[in-house]
UniProtKB/Swiss-Prot annotation:
UniProt keyword Transit peptide present: yes
Annotated source species: Schizosaccharomyces pombe (strain 972 / ATCC 24843) (Fission yeast)
Listed name of the protein: mRNA degradation protein pet127, mitochondrial
InterPro entries the UniProt entry points to: Pet127
PANTHER family xref list: MITOCHONDRIAL TRANSLATION SYSTEM COMPONENT PET127-RELATED
Name of the gene this protein is made from: pet127
Ranges in a coiled coil: none
This protein's GO CC annotations: mitochondrial envelope; mitochondrial matrix; mitochondrion
UniProt function note: Required for the degradation of mRNA in mitochondria.
One record GO biological process: mitochondrial RNA catabolic process
Keywords of the record: Mitochondrion, Transit peptide
Length: 524
């Protein structure tokens, strides 16, 4: 029996409700009662598996912990007085060719992490993943659940200009996401889809700078000398420990690496450490010699300012940062801004600030995270029922230009060692070549309706801490599998092009930005 109040639904909503809901589903003003295809935000969706010794987690060195309580951007060197607020030692970045990356522990994807798999077997988990392999999928689920809600820029100054085409998340952030699931001894291990990444990556410089700076900020001066090539000290190297937090959502086990701990941070005291290349570097990766020309000199404004960097973080990085923080039970992120040569300043961004920008409030952010993770686990379970005990790829994609779009789930059987290539020069050739066998492919759609305390909502814009947000969903297999297969190949081709593309903004724009920065430093 279906019970609803007419005043709560428009004609289209009633039609969709009758079309999508299964029999036996009951709605009233207080609760939702149904079978397994209803998710609740109040459910204990994500739980800690292990207890972490916080003393083993790294700490910020060089008095950088003084940044944490302020929550606002702090210049390393005051642009007006030229006085250093912290040790001048922090201002220069060691060139990547002088840093011994061989001393750092190597990243292990879930399919190669024996300890992660051991933990999974001990608790009876079926799926294992890491924050880096899951956040892309969870970003697509955010867009699906939120109905493509735009980010909130209320923390920016009133004078900051936002053009109409910059009010949404970046194109890369919005693009479809793909992972490879490796079936090993009863476990499904979720790795990044390496077949879509061109090697070497165009971001290799920024990645290496980030790795060296994470060490730079968490060891003292004497220890850091030992990471140089050749070592500048005869001391004994104290290797940095890898500390992991494991969390579980039903049959899904997630690994999160913990970077930093400080008792001044409320609750867990754990936070993430991020390094952020400034606008001029991100937009001009083909000319490393110009990296040092772009400097941050202002707090506010659209150019050469901290505010510009914060604006770009909201559009491109906060989604990933906030998901990683929640998956690792972290309270925020410490961000260092640089141009690969100089460090300009630091900021601690708490999770509540990222929630405000992405979701509008922490209540919505926390509730959506629980729903997001539950839905992801259900999708994985459904996918393995189609291709049981097989290795395969999963791609999630949702469209922003149609009302109430379904979530598309593309599944493709792919062996662990398979690394199918695409001709980047000819997308039509990829379509005609039938690079994916129809017998090893399946496309699904996820349809969903949302409710707050049993009342249907097209979009959840506000949520009280005491309210329950629920999602009623179901899977369907569209008939036009051939067209969906072609669409899947197009999406893969598009992702690979974007991954391989080097940013080349108009030369006049870069010249304008660089000129502003250089003129400021000449005057001062």
């Amino acid at each position: 029996m279906l019970i609803y109040k007419k005043k709560n639904f428009g004609r289209r909503s009633v039609y969709n409700l009758k079309k999508c809901l299964h029999k036996g589903f009951q709605i009233n003003s207080c609760n939702i009662k149904a079978a397994d295809n209803v998710l609740h935000s109040k459910a204990s969706a994500f739980e800690k598996v292990n207890v972490v010794d916080k003393e083993s987690i790294g700490n910020l060195q060089h008095h950088l912990d003084t940044v944490l309580p302020k929550k606002k951007f702090q210049f390393l060197r005051d642009p007006k007085t030229n006085d250093y607020k912290w040790d001048e030692y922090l201002s220069k970045i060691l060139p990547v060719d002088k840093f011994n990356f061989g001393l750092l522990s190597k990243f292990r994807p879930p399919s190669e992490d024996e300890q992660l798999q051991k933990v999974a077997n001990s608790i009876g988990a079926e799926f294992v993943g890491s924050t880096s392999s899951l956040t892309g999928l969870m970003s697509q689920l955010h867009f699906f659940i939120s109905k493509w809600k735009f980010p909130n820029f209320s923390d920016l100054s009133k004078g900051f200009y936002i053009s109409p085409n910059e009010r949404n998340f970046t194109r890369l952030c919005r693009s479809a996401s793909s992972v490879h699931i490796s079936y090993q001894n009863g476990l499904y291990c979720i790795d990044k889809d390496k077949s879509l990444t061109k090697e070497p990556s165009v971001n290799i410089i920024l990645m290496n700078v980030g790795k060296s700076l994470e060490t730079f900020f968490t060891v003292d001066k004497d220890q850091f000398l030992l990471y140089k090539k050749p070592p500048s000290s005869n001391g004994v190297l104290k290797p940095l420990k890898d500390v992991f937090q494991y969390g579980r959502c039903s049959s899904l086990l997630v690994r999160s690496q913990l970077d930093c701990y400080d008792k001044k941070i409320p609750e867990s005291g754990v936070f993430d450490l991020k390094t952020r290349a400034v606008f001029g570097v991100r937009m001009n990766q083909t000319q490393p010699e110009l990296f040092k020309s772009y400097k941050l000199t202002h707090y506010y404004g659209n150019r050469i300012s901290f505010e510009r960097e914060y604006f770009d973080l909201i559009r491109s990085a906060f989604m990933k940062y906030s998901l990683q923080a929640r998956l690792g039970y972290m309270q925020g992120v410490f961000v260092a801004y640089h141009n690969t040569s100089d460090i300009f300043g630091f900021q601690y961004i708490p999770l509540v600030a990222m929630d405000r920008a992405i979701h509008g409030s922490s209540e919505i952010g926390e509730a959506e995270f629980n729903l997001n993770l539950q839905l992801l686990e259900k999708i994985l379970q459904y996918a393995t029922s189609i291709f049981p005990k097989r290795s395969f790829r999963v791609m999630l994609s949702t469209t922003e230009d149609v009302p109430n779009p379904p979530l598309k789930v593309y599944l493709e059987v792919a062996d662990d060692k398979e690394n199918r290539g695409f001709d980047l020069l000819d997308g039509q050739k990829n379509l005609e070549a039938k690079t994916v066998s129809p017998s090893n492919f399946c496309a699904l759609e996820v349809c969903a309706l949302q409710f707050v305390n049993g009342v249907h909502k097209s979009v959840v814009k506000h949520l009280d801490e005491k309210e329950t947000w629920s999602i009623k969903y179901h899977f369907r297999k569209p008939r036009d599998q051939d067209n969906l297969l072609r669409n899947y190949i197009r999406l893969r081709d598009d992702i690979k092009r974007r991954e391989s593309k080097i940013s080349n903004p108009p030369e006049s724009l870069l010249h304008d930005y660089y000129a502003c920065s250089e003129q400021y430093y000449k005057r001062n």
